[in-house]
Amino acid sequence: MSFIERLAPLRTQPGTRLTTGLDDATLTALADRHPQLVAAVDAAAAEFARVQGELGPLLAQDEQAQIEAMQDGFVNFYADDAVTPYVALAARGPWVVTLKGAVLYDAGGYGMLGFGHTPDAVLEAMSRPQVMANIMTPSLSQQRFI
């Protein structure tokens, strides 16, 4: 099964999509040179299989309704037109796969520090005990970072 075919369970869900992502021909052309793209699709397929029973009827909803359901109860201080028009399901490096199966290239915003989504080095560092302090509290981890 090709990595594109692994997106079928996500893409065959009913509901209007807001985000289409990159077309399959482009994704196929990029796959050999971007292993994180394939890893993102694999992660999305696995995560979808894991949450499918839990999300149930939400999967059939329009993408806008899914967005609203995910953010229900949160205060989002961004303007409505600045909220991304999808629910992110999984990501690796700069590649994001939406709940509706769109694949996007996201080079990141604040907080990613150039590492992308789900960076192995950051996850490994976070798996060890860390002093939870900001810049006002000098710590060994600050020096290690530089």
PLM features: residue spans?
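Active-site-adjacent loop/helix segments that line or gate small-molecule/cofactor pockets in enzymes
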Residues: 2-92, 109, 129-131, 141
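A structural motif shared across PLP-dependent enzymes of the aminotransferase-like
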Residues: 86-95, 112-127, 137-146
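Acidic surface patches and DE-rich sequence motifs
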Residues: 98
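Generic structural signal for well-ordered beta-strand positions
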Residues: 104-105
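Short secondary-structure capping/junction motifs at helix and strand boundaries
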Residues: 133-135
